[in-house]
Amino acid sequence: MSYTDNPPQTKRALSLDDLVNHDENEKVKLQKLSEAANGSRPFAENLESDINQTETGQAAPIDNYKESTGHGSHSQKPKSRKSSNDDEETDTDDEMGASGEINFDSEMDFDYDKQHRNLLSNGSPPMNDGSDANAKLEKPSDDSIHQNSKSDEEQRIPKQGNEGNIASNYITQVPLQKQKQTEKKIAGNAVGSVVKKEEEANAAVDNIFEEKATLQSKKNNIKRDLEVLNEISASSKPSKYRNVPIWAQKWKPTIKALQSINVKDLKIDPSFLNIIPDDDLTKSVQDWVYATIYSIAPELRSFIELEMKFGVIIDAKGPDRVNPPVSSQCVFTELDAHLTPNIDASLFKELSKYIRGISEVTENTGKFSIIESQTRDSVYRVGLSTQRPRFLRMSTDIKTGRVGQFIEKRHVAQLLLYSPKDSYDVKISLNLELPVPDNDPPEKYKSQSPISERTKDRVSYIHNDSCTRIDITKVENHNQNSKSRQSETTHEVELEINTPALLNAFDNITNDSKEYASLIRTFLNNGTIIRRKLSSLSYEIFEGSKKVM
């Protein structure tokens, strides 16, 4: 059997140094193995110094450890020997004392060359030692292990042309190649770690410079913004100094009132709704008239007479005019008060001239109808004592003697309007003038004596556009019951509304209430004109500015 076919197998025992320093760093172990392989102390010292400079927190150097333990520069490995029964023993067995303790003072030298010579003399190649050393050297990195395994395989594969020299070449070349590879790997790892540390240091420096540049740029931006703000604050004033606050500004209307109106052709609407709202007094009269008409039976409404008379409201307690604490026209509601229709004779005369002059004005031509009449009204009281008395009025024309009207007059309601600023007050009364039946002719009462007689000299001005008739009447009252046959003369001014127009507006109030309201308003407006004219005429007469003939 040749040497290459069956090389002898040997087992390497652990040295004392391996047992003590089995937990040291892998790089330190590699250093020891490299020192044992080539026996070069300077290379180990240089490698140790490089490792200490590149790696922090490393274990203590090997030399220090050896000096502390008292051993030489070379690690001692035990010599292997074989017993008769092929059992493996270590050199430590020989160095044990009698008591069984290990003697650490004995010198141990481990020489790879001597071991190889012994192996060569025995005829066995150092395959296991090389594999063990290679395994220890290849522990630091996986990449180096992979590369070294490839190189080992390439070196172990012999060429076919040199089969005869395999044993000799393998024995002489393997230790030298392993030594060179170990040196290259240790140096490469040391250089790689140094380069890596330098790259990390350079990267850290670059990061520091980048951070410094970023901070500097931020500071520059802030500084530039502050400079801009300082320039703005130095060159311009706050807005409160340039613009006056709204609360301190003078008020300027956005729309100039009445400046765009053509004053030469001024047309004003009655209101913004283009209507004239009724005042409270007018509204009160409208409601009162409506309620009074509504209380009358429908078959009797056609005989309604709504009239307005002027006089002075007198309290029942005395002959003087009432004086309530009011300053404008109002409704006087005291039941005991009454109004006797009568005005001063001089005012009556001036008012007659005033109204006639209005009717004769050119623009009013055809608007007024004037009727003059002289009649005598005789009032009869008829009825049984157990019945409500009836008052019949017979109107006879004085010139012809004919009976012009024979009616029964019933008083329904009245409304007193007090006018403190005027000379006269107003009474609005609503009466019924019912015709006497044919079976009760006027001739029947000619033989009877009337309770009162009144002679009327009347001028009537009918204004159809306002549905109003103005009666200016001079009345002579003949009291038949009094002992003295003296007559009493009164001057009456009376306004009467058109009854058919009033009833038509009343019936149509649900469809068009404006017609009814307008009719009553016009009636009151005509009364206001007469009332104010009487006040102005009385002031002129009694102050002496106007002489009455």
From Swiss-Prot:
Q: What is the effect of changing L524A?
A: Temperature sensitive growth phenotype
**N-acetylserine: residues bearing it:** S2
Q: What is its EC number?
A: 3.6.1.74
Q: Which residues carry this modification: Phosphoserine?
A: S15, S124
The record ties this protein, via Pfam families, to: mRNA_triPase
Tell me how activity varies with pH: Optimum pH is 6.5-8.5.
Which GO biological-process labels does this protein carry? Answer: 7-methylguanosine mRNA capping; positive regulation of protein localization to nucleus; positive regulation of transcription elongation by RNA polymerase II
Active-site positions on this chain: K223
Location of site Essential for dimer formation?
A: D280
Compositional bias, Basic and acidic residues, is annotated for: 135-157
- Region span, Disordered: 30-169
What UniProt keywords apply to this chain's record, in alphabetical order?
Answer: Acetylation, Hydrolase, mRNA capping, mRNA processing, Nucleus, Phosphoprotein
Its UniProt entry gives the catalysed reaction(s) as: a 5'-end triphospho-ribonucleoside in mRNA + H2O = a 5'-end diphospho-ribonucleoside in mRNA + phosphate + H(+)
An example of a Gene Ontology cellular component annotation for this protein is: mRNA capping enzyme complex
The UniProt entry, under InterPro entries, shows: Cet1/Ctl1, CYTH-like_dom_sf, mRNA_triPase_Cet1, mRNA_triPase_Cet1_sf
Q: Where is the composition biased (Acidic residues)?
A: 86-96
Q: Which GO terms describe its molecular function?
A: mRNA 5'-triphosphate monophosphatase activity; polynucleotide 5'-phosphatase activity
> Changing F523A does what?
Temperature sensitive growth phenotype
Its function, per the record, reads:
First step of mRNA capping. Converts the 5'-triphosphate end of a nascent mRNA chain into a diphosphate end.
Which PANTHER family does the entry mention? POLYNUCLEOTIDE 5'-TRIPHOSPHATASE CTL1-RELATED (PTHR28118:SF1), POLYNUCLEOTIDE 5'-TRIPHOSPHATASE-RELATED (PTHR28118)
Give the miscellaneous note.
Present with 3900 molecules/cell in log phase SD medium.
Quaternary structure annotation from Swiss-Prot or TrEMBL: Heterodimer. The mRNA-capping enzyme is composed of two separate chains alpha and beta, respectively a mRNA guanylyltransferase and an mRNA 5'-triphosphate monophosphatase.
For this chain, the family text in UniProt reads:
Belongs to the fungal TPase family.
Can you say what this protein is called?
Answer: mRNA-capping enzyme subunit beta
